[in-house]
Amino acid sequence: MSSLVSTPFTTATGVQKKLGAPVPLHSFLLSRRQPAAGAGRGRAAAAAIRCAVAGNGLFTQTKPEVRRVVPPEGDASRRGVPRVKVVYVVLEAQYQSSVTAAVRELNADPRRAAGFEVVGYLVEELRDEETYKTFCADLADANVFIGSLIFVEELALKVKDAVEKERDRMDAVLVFPSMPEVMRLNKLGSFSMSQLGQSKSPFFQLFKRKKNSGGFADSMLKLVRTLPKVLKYLPSDKAQDARLYILSLQFWLGGSPDNLQNFLKMIAVSYVPALKGADIKYDDPVLFLDAGIWHPLAPTMYDDVKEYLNWYGTRRDTNDKLKDPNAPVIGLVLQRSHIVTGDDGHYVAVIMELEAKGAKVIPIFAGGLDFSGPTQRYLVDPITGKPFVNAVVSLTGFALVGGPARQDHPKAIAALQKLDVPYIVALPLVFQTTEEWLNSTLGLHPIQVALQVALPELDGGMEPIVFAGRDPRTGKSHALHKRVEQLCTRAIRWAELKRKTKEEKKLAITVFSFPPDKGNVGTAAYLNVFNSIYSVLQDLKKDGYNVEGLPDTAEALIEEVIHDKEAQFNSPNLNVAYRMNVREYQSLTSYASLLEENWGKPPGNLNSDGENLLVYGKQYGNVFIGVQPTFGYEGDPMRLLFSKSASPHHGFAAYYTFVEKIFQADAVLHFGTHGSLEFMPGKQVGMSDACYPDSLIGNIPNIYYYAANNPSEATVAKRRSYANTISYLTPPAENAGLYKGLKQLSELISSYQSLKDTGRGPQIVSSIISTAKQCNLDKDVPLPEEGVELPPNERDLIVGKVYAKIMEIESRLLPCGLHVIGEPPSAIEAVATLVNIASLDRPEDEIYSLPNILAQTVGRNIEDVYRGSDKGILADVELLRQITEASRGAITAFVERTTNNKGQVVDVTNKLSTMLGFGLSEPWVQHLSKTKFIRADREKLRTLFTFLGECLKLIVADNELGSLKLALEGSYVEPGPGGDPIRNPKVLPTGKNIHALDPQAIPTTAALKSAKIVVDRLLERQKVDNGGKYPETIALVLWGTDNIKTYGESLAQVLWMIGVRPVADTFGRVNRVEPVSLEELGRPRIDVVVNCSGVFRDLFINQMNLLDRAVKMVAELDEPEEMNYVRKHAQEQARELGVSLREAATRVFSNASGSYSSNVNLAVENASWTDEKQLQDMYLSRKSFAFDCDAPGAGMREQRKTFELALATADATFQNLDSSEISLTDVSHYFDSDPTKLVQGLRKDGRAPSSYIADTTTANAQVRTLSETVRLDARTKLLNPKWYEGMMKSGYEGVREIEKRLTNTVGWSATSGQVDNWVYEEANATFIEDEAMRKRLMDTNPNSFRKLVQTFLEASGRGYWETSEENLEKLRELYSEVEDKIEGIDR
């Protein structure tokens, strides 16, 4: 059935077509699209299109003139009737039509005592300088100002500045819930809020921060209900003025034309001098229910759900589907203001569409900002406690509890847990018209993303589908046909999961394979995919799901999925589950023809046999395990890699068509971090039906296992593929340990410490120097020639520095092995995680770190110990080792006391209570009593170990399988933050619906403090390496995940480099900055070139705006060039480019909207590049899109020349490592974003920039050179038996992990040239020359082993590895041998 839309769509015919049918416009997402020729448009609509395509780059170009209502021309002046001018500013446009109707009716009354001129502004329009000037001009002769829901700080300050100038002159100023700065403008006779926020203000408590943060609006509503009755009988003018303010709020919240008429009459006759004593009668406010149930066809609003259901059951207009007692029931959450103002057409459309599709609806509304009560009151049966509904869809866009300013997520989560159904939060456009959104590559306005996408996600909200647009002429919301249909179909599909039996449900499990190769099937970050799938399916089988034919082992499962059983000889193909002929593909895939621009006619040559499109995978009963096709770069890699836009290929589209329409999955489970679906081209957030992720996922509920430590990309999956993201644990981190020569070095140092004062001291030092050189440590520690006579203090210093280096290696944290879903770590495996949790001070919780407590015991500060160890002071290195060992021992003793004889943690709470407070019986005290730290502060230890006990429970909890089953059963999955569990243990337990954070909450104060330490160390290190000079420019990278985990540390680093500090508003949101004085800064302002990842751009575009404003502000400061390198370079570049200083100061870059990565990594992984210049051109073409704070709605604009000139001034490149789980060679993203060699080519002097990595993975933050970090990575992972043997335990997938580290090392050679030759030599000795290891690798995963051999040969061929011809000949022979072996396997 076609969509039912209740109100006419008052926009151009061409745009109606675009919204009403599958839109053949994927290409518009990254191109300049013009209006349809001849389409009739009003002036405002045309302006909107011009803005979106080529205008001044603001988000909206609607003008207040469409909201200006004046008395009939000449009429008022002829009759001598006074004119009253009212100016209003609101967040959303729903009041526009109601106010307009009210004013027109007032002015049409022949007996009126006044003529009303009323003009309204949407707060977002005030960004435009011309509109702001008009606003100020309107205020200059206004009698009354009204403001409501003004919560965007920079715009709130503009409103405050303009109104403040006219406040004393105006007759009345009324501001309803807004930021305190604006609320203080209130003035009604003697009533004022000028003291708001001060303790003596009666309204102070309403703004006071409290945990129940939905309370402000609800407190206001209680006042609205009760105060007028009380104040009416108080004689003072103050009381009556306060009463009229509250009545005004009643009228405003009532919102109907009648209420607004009476509101304007009341204010005019009470406060406009020309109307004092006039015969103007007004009625009391018509009060609507604060909360209730509303249906457009119902005779009334209902306050009783049983009454509503009785009416619903007696309706005669329903279709047969609705009469089915088993029909799905959808709860809708609506904004009361839209209903009372009559701006409800978009709500009607959703209700009608759901009912047309056979779903019953219970549409509830509330007038405040707390919907938790109404959801319980109207959606849950009070007798049984069971929900009436199978799914809930919020159409408000806001968090469930709290509006734009503050939220109470725990309260919302508690309410949603009681409902226990899927929770979808759909969006009406607020700050853009429909055409502006359609033409925007960004999609949703960034402030709407922050308020109405990011915040509902913290409640567990998902599927941010834009279902309603806004008419620029009337301001009314209207349904978007295809979007409403998509929303309703998907809501019903989620509801069906609640109703279907387990046996009949069909599940499509999707695994990934990149780079495309049999050895890579089942790629996912730190997850053993096939073992996990096997574990999940066994559990689902026990639960009653049909998994017929599941093999007996995980290994057999791998074989059945990855090998083409029909192939007689060696075949690169996987098992073919379905052959789709071209006619079937085209008939079932509505957008198939759009892919031909990039891929030609179907079937093409990817996932194809030349006649049919091939779907790879294997079906077991009602479960299909499929392999997601790759991006398609392997088909014609260089053409596509250079493309700023792309599209899925026919095979990719066919896969999802098969899953949805042929296999008919009830849900798809994307297994592991991460695939390609969510990164396909389209709007960043708030997609249209012309966006590929939306087209591909279709109507299938999407469940997605995502690594807990990667909330940023999980958020992209949530927003762009409508995923319910369930977190999984990465393997517990362990200390790297020592091996081979490093272990020997440790033993020599131990001997030196006990024998240094004997005659053997010099001899042992000589051995230490010799062994250190054999271990290639001379690259990291300056070592003298062997046999040189050294005085004792110099001997100590050399030994101390070598000791510090091997301690750094030994204590380096690394995840060993791969995680399996449903297998939480054992207690002993959790010890290392607890040790690291215990290593951080947590001042907000008054918890001291264990190293800090132990250092204080011997009269030291742990920071001083770290500094001494870093300098190689032997005594401090030894003390740090003792502290580290004592910490591990104390925590191990504690964990052992909570563990049963099977190694499982049991009943931590009770066992902890029996330990605490009993002095020497506390296991950590018992352990420390055997060390030099026997006098450690017992109370601090007790506080710490109480906290560690709670963490231990979370670490070993297993919710991953349980949450998957909840999602499959159509239940609510509890949300939780993603990130680093060491920094934030609230990430645990895993199995939560992973979310990021409020993007306006960063950087935090703690992040600023950490950032300052790192930047200061970076600049000092660069001065040492650069002849005492500060770097003038630093080129750096901002990652989405890093900034979530660290609450904005790297963002804060940029701000500190240029010398500005963020300023939080009343609600703690960071939306502006101020310069730090040069005196306070104590150094020059460093210029920056900021490369934001595509994911950072999607999640933190408000912070990109903040950064760009900050850089431009600094460039415009009147300061000496030698103290302000931003200004110095911007002036030079302005002259060279012939542009303004402000434009030349562009420094914030990323990909084009909807595009991700430089694709250098993909070229390296596929070995599909010829020379480094090609990689550098690729980087520049993909990453040279600039953000402009002066045109924030324009999206990312290509400014390659500006990007090149800025990079050419870089003296250093810089990146951050923030957690132990992911380092430089673990993923390809780091080298993909590294511009080191590129900068060298752009610099006029041809000098290579210094390259640094900040390591904040431990409490002792370090700044190392890139080459030092690559060496450390190689020693602790690739060359470390503890790491590679841990990987080998994971079998097939472990071999792939080893190969991936070598490939990423080659990537660093390509982009930076910072990999030492010995790294390749040692890797070759470890994996190729060792016959037993070579055989294990080849037998376990021959495809990945072939890639390993190929990578060694490539490293040599490209000049990154100099080795013997004998080694190369061996590798060539091995390549032929493994090719034969692969052919033998497939034969």
Curated annotation (Swiss-Prot):
<comment type="pathway">
    <text>Porphyrin-containing compound metabolism; chlorophyll biosynthesis.</text>
</comment>
<keyword id="KW-0149">Chlorophyll biosynthesis</keyword>
<dbReference type="Pfam" id="PF02514">
    <property type="entry name" value="CobN-Mg_chel"/>
</dbReference>
<dbReference type="InterPro" id="IPR011771">
    <property type="entry name" value="BchH"/>
</dbReference>
<keyword id="KW-0547">Nucleotide-binding</keyword>
<protein>
    <recommendedName>
        <fullName>Magnesium-chelatase subunit ChlH, chloroplastic</fullName>
        <ecNumber>6.6.1.1</ecNumber>
    </recommendedName>
</protein>
<keyword id="KW-0067">ATP-binding</keyword>
<keyword id="KW-0934">Plastid</keyword>
<dbReference type="InterPro" id="IPR003672">
    <property type="entry name" value="CobN/Mg_chltase"/>
</dbReference>
<comment type="function">
    <text>Involved in chlorophyll biosynthesis. Catalyzes the insertion of magnesium ion into protoporphyrin IX to yield Mg-protoporphyrin IX. The reaction takes place in two steps, with an ATP-dependent activation followed by an ATP-dependent chelation step. May be involved in the plastid-to-nucleus retrograde signaling.</text>
</comment>
<comment type="subunit">
    <text>The magnesium chelatase complex is a heterotrimer consisting of subunits CHLI, CHLD and CHLH.</text>
</comment>
<keyword id="KW-0602">Photosynthesis</keyword>
<keyword id="KW-0150">Chloroplast</keyword>
<dbReference type="GO" id="GO:0031969">
    <property type="term" value="C:chloroplast membrane"/>
</dbReference>
<feature type="transit peptide" description="Chloroplast">
    <location>
        <begin position="1"/>
        <end position="50"/>
    </location>
</feature>
<keyword id="KW-0472">Membrane</keyword>
<dbReference type="GO" id="GO:0009570">
    <property type="term" value="C:chloroplast stroma"/>
</dbReference>
<comment type="similarity">
    <text>Belongs to the Mg-chelatase subunit H family.</text>
</comment>
<dbReference type="GO" id="GO:0015979">
    <property type="term" value="P:photosynthesis"/>
</dbReference>
<dbReference type="GO" id="GO:0005524">
    <property type="term" value="F:ATP binding"/>
</dbReference>
<dbReference type="InterPro" id="IPR022571">
    <property type="entry name" value="Mg_chelatase_H_N"/>
</dbReference>
<keyword id="KW-0436">Ligase</keyword>
<dbReference type="GO" id="GO:0016851">
    <property type="term" value="F:magnesium chelatase activity"/>
</dbReference>
<keyword id="KW-0809">Transit peptide</keyword>
<dbReference type="Pfam" id="PF11965">
    <property type="entry name" value="DUF3479"/>
</dbReference>
<dbReference type="GO" id="GO:0015995">
    <property type="term" value="P:chlorophyll biosynthetic process"/>
</dbReference>
